């Protein structure tokens, strides 16, 4: 499966549950290697995703850097590919976050 088709399917499924997926583009002030997508849940949870076409797809050094940096700051950042997508989906759907005002 092509990465864009895989990513589109996840986006479509999550948007049906009220999520917002924002595509981050490196040439718009987003640093090189920063995750592809910001995922916002309807309950206030947010995470970053770097989509990969397979578990063996190369992760660039800056992608690894940003994934580690974001996680160390308390944000959730993931490398997601077809082989781990179900685990990722379960983790996101189970997040017990609620909206705070």
Spans of features found by a protein language model:
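Catalytic phosphate/metal-binding cores of nucleic-acid and nucleotide-processing enzymes, i.e., regions
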Residues: 1-101
């Amino acid at each position: 499966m092509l990465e864009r088709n895989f990513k589109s399917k996840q986006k479509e499924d999550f948007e049906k549950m009220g999520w917002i997926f924002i595509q981050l583009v490196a040439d718009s002030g987003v640093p090189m290697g920063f995750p592809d997508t910001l995922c916002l849940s309807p309950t206030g949870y947010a995470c970053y995703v770097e989509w990969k076409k397979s578990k063996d797809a190369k992760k660039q050094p800056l992608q690894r850097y940003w994934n580690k940096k974001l996680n160390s700051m308390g944000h959730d950042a993931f490398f997601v590919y077809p082989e781990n997508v179900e685990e990722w989906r379960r983790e996101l759907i189970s997040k017990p976050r609620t909206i705070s005002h």
